[in-house]
UniProtKB/Swiss-Prot annotation:
CDD domains: cytochrome_b_C (cd00290), Cytochrome_b_N (cd00284)
PANTHER family with a match to the protein in the record: CYTOCHROME B (PTHR19271:SF16)
Biological classification of the source: Eukaryota, Metazoa, Chordata, Craniata, Vertebrata
Cofactor or coenzyme needed: heme b
Source organism of this protein record: Cheirogaleus major (Greater dwarf lemur)
Keywords from the named record: Electron transport, Heme, Iron, Membrane, Metal-binding, Mitochondrion, Mitochondrion inner membrane, Respiratory chain, Transmembrane, Transmembrane helix, Transport, Ubiquinone
Biological function: Component of the ubiquinol-cytochrome c reductase complex (complex III or cytochrome b-c1 complex) that is part of the mitochondrial respiratory chain. The b-c1 complex mediates electron transfer from ubiquinol to cytochrome c. Contributes to the generation of a proton gradient across the mitochondrial membrane that is then used for ATP synthesis.
Tagged with keyword Amino-acid biosynthesis: no
GO CC annotation, single: mitochondrial inner membrane
Chief site of localization: mitochondrion
InterPro entries named in the record: Cyt_b/b6_C, Cyt_b/b6_C_sf, Cyt_b/b6_N, Cytb/b6-like_sf, Cytochrome_b, Cytochrome_b_C_euk/bac, Cytochrome_b_N_euk/bac, Di-haem_cyt_TM
Gene3D superfamilies in the cross-refs: Cytochrome Bc1 Complex, Chain C (1.20.810.10)
Protein's name according to its UniProt entry: Cytochrome b
Length: 379
């Protein structure tokens, strides 16, 4: 008798995606982060659902409803901190996942890569709107500052900002719609993930060598299911250490003060995962220029496939490109640090230099190094 997983219409799809999927035999632990992102999404949807049962999207009660969740709801504190720190884990995995794609040349699978960029933007939008919901000082002022950036768009900017706000300032209407969007977007993300996987399974996974894996494939289960479970275990250990020992480590103390439109916090800053983009935004004195640089800091990923000049897909055997990749990584760490610092000397100058280096590395230096490495192949 034929196995049910190979004949049942629904199980057949699951089988071809997660069980009998032919996978390259040599993919390293850097390939674990796709499944870890799936786990993060599941954690966020489940914890978010339970939080939504007790949260009220109203300016007068939002802050106290979050306090109520932490104090009065059974295990509410752990659900809330799992959700808040789960977002940090989500972005940590996202950045590593994108970095792996850049390092090993996965961006040559253009459909998968482009859906991935859309996913990155969607997750960033979801996280931003989620940060507004507790209605603390940083929630309110973060929402005010970031939504205000749209006013830099010529002619229609101000109209767009007021349209998003639902009035003339961030208020009840803004909070209500942000909650609605924050609730629906994870399900849109789930649909996009399915499209992402659909395109990935059309071409098959890349591997560290960047060569075709057709000659040597192994079934996904049990080899990579076990490997992914080990990665998941590490992720959960890290998440639980954060949640149980220092749940507020990555948060902002200002968000424990209820939102007050009459009192601006001394330093308005987003969560750590947005700091690199925030530093790029602040390093340009012109408002429109800053907004364009902010968008381009992420959108530049879409240009990377067009800038590829190398004859080798992976960076595994390209020492110059490897050095430049790790310089780019260090530059992103510097930008993240600068984003959390006040706007004063020497941080302004460091931020500007790091921002210039970021764009120069991706647009000019790395493609040039690839051309050089092509020449070296002939030596």
């Amino acid at each position: 008798m034929t196995n049910i997983r190979k004949t049942h219409p629904l199980m057949k799809i699951m089988n071809s995606s997660f069980i009998d999927l032919p996978a390259p035999s040599n993919i390293s632990s850097w390939w674990n982060f796709g499944s870890l992102l799936g786990a993060c999404l599941a954690i966020q949807i489940i914890t978010g659902l339970f939080l939504a049962m007790h949260y009220t999207a109203d300016t007068t009660t939002a802050f106290s409803s979050v306090t109520h969740i932490c104090r009065d709801v059974n295990h509410g504190w752990i659900i809330r901190y799992l959700h808040a720190n789960g977002a940090s884990m989500f972005f940590l995995c996202l950045f590593i996942h994108v970095g792996r794609g850049m390092y090993y040349g996965s961006f040559t699978m253009s459909e998968t890569w482009n859906i991935g960029i859309i996913l990155l933007f969607t997750v960033m939008a979801t996280a931003f709107m989620g940060y507004v919901l507790p209605w603390g000082q940083m929630s309110f002022w973060g929402a005010t500052v970031i939504t205000n950036l749209l006013s830099a768009i010529p002619y229609i900017g101000t109209m767009m900002v007021e349209w998003i706000w639902g009035g003339f300032s961030v208020d009840k209407a803004t909070l209500t719609r942000f909650f609605a969007f924050h609730f629906i977007l994870p399900f849109i993300i789930t649909a996009l993930v399915m499209v992402h996987l659909l395109f990935l399974h059309e071409t098959g996974s890349n591997n560290p060598l960047g060569t075709s894996s057709d000659s040597d494939k192994i079934p996904f289960h049990p080899y990579y299911t076990i490997k992914d479970l080990l990665g998941l275990l590490f992720l959960l250990i890290l998440l639980m250490i954060l949640v149980l020992f220092s749940p507020d480590l990555l948060g902002d103390p200002d968000n424990y003060t209820p939102a007050n439109p009459l009192n601006t916090p001394p330093h308005i800053k987003p969560e750590w995962y947005f700091l690199f983009a925030y530093a790029i935004l602040r390093s340009i004195p012109n408002k429109l220029g800053g907004v364009l640089a902010l968008v381009m800091s992420i959108l530049i990923l879409a240009i990377i496939p067009m800038l590829q000049t190398t004859k080798q897909r992976s960076m595994m055997f390209r020492p110059f490109s490897q050095i430049l990749f790790w310089i780019l990584t260090a530059d992103l760490f510097i930008l993240t640090w600068i984003g959390g610092q006040p706007v004063e000397y020497p941080f302004i100058t460091i931020g500007q230099m790091a921002s210039i280096l970021y764009f120069f590395l991706i647009l000019i230096i790395m493609p040039t190094a690839s051309l050089m490495e092509n020449k070296m192949l002939k030596w």
